[in-house]
A protein has these predicted regions:
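Catalytic His-Asp segment of secreted/periplasmic serine-dependent ester chemistry enzymes
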Residues: 164-247
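Residue-level recognition of beta-strand->loop/alpha-helix junctions
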Residues: 93-95, 160, 201-204
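Generic structural signal for well-ordered alpha-helices
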Residues: 109, 142-146, 185
């Protein structure tokens, strides 16, 4: 028994050390620059169609980090699809690289409310995964965020963290990040639904594609989505926007 316990302790220490090394390497890794930011926004569709003000809030992905042209950002792709269904869409993108849910609540939500949007999409919480925001805070901030946005009468759709098993990371960090990401995304969805938002299980819908074809899915840093990844995100998100608007 003593030998077994010593072996177990040694294995645990080795695992913790390995994870620690992977975290250090991940922090030192060079990711895509977030400046200068892409100019995402504008109008889409015919001016004779019914107007729809569409606000997108979130982190670096909402800001289009991972692609070099705004037309490949998921916010733009969603605006184009909404316009294709007979709407004159005004797209407002508030995403800021590095934002956590608390940042969106304090900084982006007030700006979005001033714009009086008809439809809001929030894609958030990858940075909450990385920075270990407590699940209670994630849940509470998600609920508060949706409640405030809905005071404008807007339809609100929310997606939590994507599949966090990024190609940029090695095992066992990759699996641990995936587990943590699922927990955070579930907390986001729980809080958002409680406040009346529609939610998108982004990791579930897009994770298999990112795992199957990382070269097509990721940008050159193997962390942020590239053009193919953002198309997959738009494919996952857009049906929920239409369903929410139809309610």
């Amino acid at each position: 028994m003593a030998r077994f316990l010593l072996t177990l302790i040694a294995a645990t220490v080795a695992l913790v050390a390995m994870v620690g090394i992977e975290i250090v390497l991940a922090l030192k890794r060079e990711y895509l620059a977030t400046e200068p930011a892409l100019e995402i926004g504008g109008t889409f569709g015919s001016a004779s169609d019914p107007p729809l003000t569409f606000a997108v809030l979130g982190d670096s992905t909402a800001a289009g980090v991972g692609v070099s042209r705004a037309e490949h950002a998921y916010a733009t792709l969603l605006a184009e699809r909404l316009a294709a269904e007979g709407r004159h869409v005004r797209l407002l993108a508030f995403g800021i690289s590095g934002a956590r849910i608390g940042d969106v609540l304090r900084e982006q939500v007030p700006e979005a409310i001033e714009a009086e949007p008809d439809l809001v999409f929030v894609g958030i919480s990858a940075n909450d995964v990385i920075h270990f925001t407590s699940l209670d805070d994630v849940r509470a901030d998600s609920s508060d965020m949706v409640e405030r946005l809905r005071t404008t009468g807007a339809t609100v759709v929310v997606a939590g963290a994507p599949d966090m098993r990024a190609a940029a990371w090695h095992e066992p960090l990759r699996s641990l990040a995936g587990w943590r990401g699922r927990s955070v995304a579930a907390a986001v969805e729980e809080g958002a639904r409680a406040a009346g938002a529609t939610t998108v299980p982004l990791a579930e819908r897009t994770g298999p594609f990112f795992a199957r074809d990382p070269e097509e899915a990721y940008g050159c840093d193997d962390f942020h989505p590239g053009a193919g990844g953002y198309r997959a995100w738009a494919d996952a998100i857009y049906p929920e926007l239409e369903k929410a608007l139809a309610r």
